[in-house]
């Protein structure tokens, strides 16, 4: 039986977002007078959404107030700068076009906030994706099957 649909993750699968994520992490850390993180450190901290990324990026012993401030700073910066260096990985647009031409419905499910997932998918993949779902405060996150 041929596949009817294909669902992809966004960060690190379809899009290389590491540069913009690193810049946003380091902006927040700098504003809080914390040491900056390297690109490789940020790469190792990614997984399970931005709150976890920032917990891993903040210095040991950072309290919840510092985490809250880092979240606000990161979100504001990333919202304005999330496409500075972000781009599809080589071959991804071609792959999605071929799958779509073969009648396979395409979608994205991401732990990235929904308000960031939507514009990134529209900008880089346009009408190729039938749906793009990101994390919301009132819903489960991947890998929960209900997402």
Tell me the role of every PLM-derived stretch.
Residues 3, 96, 128-130:
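Core-facing hydrophobic residues within beta-strands of well-ordered domains
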Residues 55-94:
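Metal-dependent phosphoesterase signature
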Residues 28-29, 49-64, 120:
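Helix-loop "lid/cap" segments that line or gate small-molecule binding pockets
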Residues 84-87, 107, 113-147:
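Substrate-recognition "cap/lid" segment bordering the active-site pocket of phosphatases
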Residues 1-44, 55:
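Active-site neighborhood of HAD-like aspartate-dependent phosphohydrolases
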Residues 91-104:
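Catalytic-core regions built around general acid/base machinery
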Residues 20, 49-52, 94, 115-116:
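Short alpha-helical
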